[in-house]
Amino acid sequence: MRGTAYYCTVEELQERGRDNIPEQFRSNTHLIYSSPATLAFNSPGAEGFGVKRAGLAIPDSIMLIVAPGCCGRNTSVLSSMRAYHDRFYYLLMDETDIVTGRHLKKIPKAVAEICEGLEKKPSVVMICITCVDALLGTDMERVCRKAEEAAGLSVKPCYMYALTREGRKPPMVHVRQSIYSLLEPKKKKGNVVNLLGFFSPLVDDCELYDLLHGAGVKTIHEISRCKDYEEYQTMSEANFNL
């Protein structure tokens, strides 16, 4: 098997049983190297879910992109999609902002202004910042707390840092933490599971659903199938995550 990629379907694993798991999947039999960068990999099947699109996985959320024009312009393609045309907002940075950091004081005001101008109050505002703020050493958590006070709703950071792609916490790892940090603690239910790690739903006839139901799981949550913020909050009832 050396030098050859190995894979196994869920059905094949089930047929083998727990006592006959392939050695390729048993970390105690050989070294399995997994770079932090692999956690940030987005497969073609994910339909292009980068930091910005993933940050809007929460139902009824909106995003404020704080960046120079050159960094934010590629979002215009996403903005043209029906599902996102009214969910992206921009706070452009100029040279003075970069030198003085004055744009940080504008963010809470911008968030409050956006929320006041919307007919429906968003569930959360995601603040997307770029490598510029990474180099400036911006404390975005503090800025988001100020924005929460100004707007009266949850505000979370979303780091579009290409610089950290190979680091301990790549952008896609951090955006997942931001998304699920909004779940409020609830009493756990033994027959509920969350499917995490991706932002598009599995196909309806995926064999994983039948396997989980056969194991006694009654409710399977996927963030992409949540219709509203209330349903998203029910994900905190899950007994375990897969």
Residue ranges and their predicted role:
Residues 1-242:
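An N-terminal assembly and electron-transfer interface module characteristic of large anaerobic redox
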